[in-house]
Amino acid sequence: MERFKKASSIIETLKQQGHEAYFVGGSVRDLIIDRPIGDIDIATSALPEEVMAIFPRNVPVGLEHGTVIVLENGEPYEVTTFRTESEYEDFRRPSSVQFVRSLEEDLKRRDFTMNAIAMTEEGEMVDLFAGQEAIQQREIVTVGNAADRFQEDALRMMRGIRFVSALGFSLETKTKQAIETYGHLLEHIAIERITVEFEKLLTGTYCVKGLKELVETKLFSHLPYLQMSEERLLKATQYKWDSFETDIEAWAFFLYCIGEEHPSVFLRQWKFSNKKIKDIVAVLLAIRTRKEKDWDTVLLYKTGIYIAEMAERVYEAMIESYNPTSVKRVQSMFHALPIQGRQEMNVTGNDLLNWANKKPGPWVADMLQKIEEAIVKGNVVNEKERIREWLQGCNLL
């Protein structure tokens, strides 16, 4: 409750000004579940302009949605006006938002009952939709009619399964049936938004359970490049998923598990940046080599520590070893390398031109590459004169 106490002064101030205010959303849910608390959000009857007048230190980030960030005790808090939403457009966004003075109206528009619990600054729960009961039953239940909630915003179906992966809860029967019925509406949602939810699913503690729900609800058939992948996804659930340190590792492991032969094509369908695609593919290539042989100095140098660490963690997950010393061993090997990048070489192309008394050409790059590999292998010390002597001894000058 310590973090809530820090934010309680905002609620107290709003109440002193004649407004209602409560803690809401994921932070309240996680407090009940006893999970680490993320951002603390506050809902209030005060209109955005009233919030800004009461708290001069603010950032008006989403006034059309009633959200103002209030800076209090050195922390930013989202303060959002109670609101209700009209008919939704394209199964993803409300055509308009109306500010209201009723907490109940605000809570009833939310996705799942566990996310529709409010809490006073004293820690008293306002639970109008049996959210605590759902948490106790470890069930994910929509607020009100599941069909209505998913037709309002089809992304809620992905969010539901993402929560299965994060919390280990199960989808309540009617909620699950509604996903099976309305899964096709997911095709109205921007790929980028789906990718965010799927990535959270892959990094969840109960990822296997989430993947199984994805298959059982047939929601996978509306995801990029997975339309005909039921068997591949079931294959992925047979692996023991670890909690990876990065999303790059989670995607690499997922692609390995489903046996994806064209990872770059697959990832482009999910609208990833070129940098992220490059990193995931690099991890997969490093794993392929790692399966054939252990790390050596040249392989580690060429791979680089950033990719090598991730590849080693994924490789450990693949063989279900989870040896905590394996990544440390890779780190120690890398830090023991004579150089960790070409920029650390104590010789330049100009040095080679002077020593050889030859015109510039492709031979300079070839020679630098030979020297680089020799330094990494320990065949020559990374000192200019020693490198010159080595070149002469090898008849390369």
Swiss-Prot record:
ATP binds at residues 26, 29, 110, 153, 156, 159, 162. It comes from the Bacteria. It holds the Pfam family PolyA_pol_RNAbd. It catalyses: a tRNA precursor + 2 CTP + ATP = a tRNA with a 3' CCA end + 3 diphosphate; a tRNA with a 3' CCA end + 2 CTP + ATP = a tRNA with a 3' CCACCA end + 3 diphosphate. CTP binds at residues 26, 29, 110, 153, 156, 159, 162. Its cofactor is Mg(2+). GO terms for molecular function: ATP binding; CCA tRNA nucleotidyltransferase activity; magnesium ion binding; tRNA binding. Keywords: ATP-binding, Magnesium, Metal-binding, Nucleotide-binding, Nucleotidyltransferase, RNA repair, RNA-binding, Transferase, tRNA processing. It is an enzyme of class 2 (transferase). CDD domains: NT_ClassII-CCAase. Mg(2+) binds at residues 39, 41. Its EC number is 2.7.7.72. GO terms for biological process: RNA repair; tRNA 3'-terminal CCA addition. SUPFAM superfamilies: Nucleotidyltransferase (SSF81301), Poly A polymerase C-terminal region-like (SSF81891). InterPro entries: Bact_CCA-adding_enz_type3_sf, CCA-adding_enz_C, CCA-adding_enz_firmicutes, NT_sf, PolA_pol_head_dom, PolyA_RNA-bd. A single active site specifically recognizes both ATP and CTP and is responsible for their addition. Homodimer. Belongs to the tRNA nucleotidyltransferase/poly(A) polymerase family. Bacterial CCA-adding enzyme type 3 subfamily. Catalyzes the addition and repair of the essential 3'-terminal CCA sequence in tRNAs without using a nucleic acid template. Adds these three nucleotides in the order of C, C, and A to the tRNA nucleotide-73, using CTP and ATP as substrates and producing inorganic pyrophosphate. tRNA 3'-terminal CCA addition is required both for tRNA processing and repair. Also involved in tRNA surveillance by mediating tandem CCA addition to generate a CCACCA at the 3' terminus of unstable tRNAs. While stable tRNAs receive only 3'-terminal CCA, unstable tRNAs are marked with CCACCA and rapidly degraded. This is CCA-adding enzyme. It comes from Bacillus cereus (strain G9842). The lineage of its organism: Bacteria, Bacillati, Bacillota, Bacilli, Bacillales.
